[in-house]
Amino acid sequence: MTFSCKKGDPALKKIAVLGTGNIAQTIAVDLKASGHEVRLFAPENLIHRFRDFADTQVIECVGALEARERIDIITSDIDQAVGQADYIIVCVTGSHHQEYAQMLKGHTSAEQIMVTFNGCMASLIYKN
């Protein structure tokens, strides 16, 4: 299965990436390079972590993934990030899943697909 597509392709998805670290930023760049609409979210108290690229919204990855992409939306507004997103990818440490689940409560729909990372029973947290 590939997520790569071109503009106008029905496979083009709106994807919200939640998190401020290297994994969230790399996933955002990779998905954008594959043609998707990408929304990168950080809560208000962490949005400063995006200050290096907040003006241009361009993130550059170096290493195994070499890419430089302009992210569609960088926001601390949860509705702007996840509203009408096809996929929500939560890239936070296990200790933050409860916090993010509370932020997402009431802002998601049954049609959206949520992806989480790590084995801290995150799926049970988001199910509730």
Where are these regions (language model features)?
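NAD(P)+-binding Rossmann beta1-loop-alpha1 motif at the extreme N-terminus of oxidoreductases
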Residues: 3-60, 82
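Hydrophobic/aromatic beta-strand patches that form the interior of the parallel beta-sheet core
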Residues: 39-41, 75, 89, 115
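Residues at the C-termini of beta-strands that transition into short coil/loop
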Residues: 44, 78, 118
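Short, flexible, glycine-rich and Lys/Arg-enriched loop motifs at helix boundaries
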Residues: 56-70
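Rossmann-like NAD(P)-binding element
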Residues: 66-108
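Rossmann-like NAD(P)(H) cofactor-binding subdomain of soluble oxidoreductases
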Residues: 94-128
